[in-house]
């Protein structure tokens, strides 16, 4: 009997929390993450992964953002300056569901809490097994994946700099190699995307820097069931 593939529930995992300082709300957090809701071991593993992620994000908000939010509020009150309650929101976007593949990324955004920051994380799942797939799964064996993607990123960045469509730090070539992470990728209809954190290779105005390669025989490619 063929195993049923993981399917996302129409009701995602949703959590909200508010922190106060001196009885005044200074930080709110809202978390919306994917959920399967099934009873199989694969579904439970998937849901446990994102429950742990949600808890870790709320701990990050309390440990890192709350002190800054409280300080911002007290400073504004002392100066009689305008002030807004800080807000943190973590949400997800499904980028590809095709065959055995489920790919998505999450983004955490922080508002009214300088410096401006967006955090992205991505996961690509095998819907048959309920396990995460590594970046190397989408390239032929022994492919120098990092070298190939960094080279492609450098070429794209150079073209963008020449046409004035994007800005990078002067040493972007070295930074693209140094800040590369094999976990920072997702799949979409147009190919494989990999990305860099804010401020790591380009000014804040560029946000999260995203590069892509179309699917091809030399990789990246989508594996068929027989190739798993």
What residue ranges belong to the model's regions?
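Compositionally biased intrinsically disordered regions enriched in Thr/Gly
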Residues: 1-228
């Amino acid at each position: 009997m063929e195993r049923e593939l993981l399917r996302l529930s129409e009701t995602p995992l949703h959590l909200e929390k508010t922190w106060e300082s001196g009885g005044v709300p200074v930080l709110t957090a809202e978390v919306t993450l994917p959920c399967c809701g099934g009873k199989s071991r694969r579904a439970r593993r998937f849901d446990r992964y994102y429950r742990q992620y949600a808890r870790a994000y709320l701990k990050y908000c309390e440990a890192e953002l709350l002190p800054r939010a409280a300080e911002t509020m007290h400073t504004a009150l002392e100066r009689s300056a305008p002030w807004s309650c800080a807000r943190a929101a973590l949400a997800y976007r499904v980028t590809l569901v095709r065959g055995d593949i489920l790919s998505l990324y999450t983004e955490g955004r922080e508002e009214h809490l300088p410096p401006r920051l967006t955090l992205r994380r991505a996961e690509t799942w095998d819907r048959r097994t309920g396990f995460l797939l590594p970046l190397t799964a989408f390239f032929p064996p022994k492919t120098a994946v990092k070298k190939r993607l960094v080279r492609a990123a450098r070429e794209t960045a150079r073209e963008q700099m020449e046409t004035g469509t994007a800005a990078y730090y002067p040493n972007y070539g070295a930074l693209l190699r140094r800040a590369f992470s094999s976990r920072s990728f997702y799949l979409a209809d147009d190919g494989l995307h990999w990305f860099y954190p804010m401020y790591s290779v380009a000014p804040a105005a560029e946000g999260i820097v995203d590069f892509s390669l179309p699917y091809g025989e030399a990789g990246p490619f989508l594996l068929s069931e027989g190739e798993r």
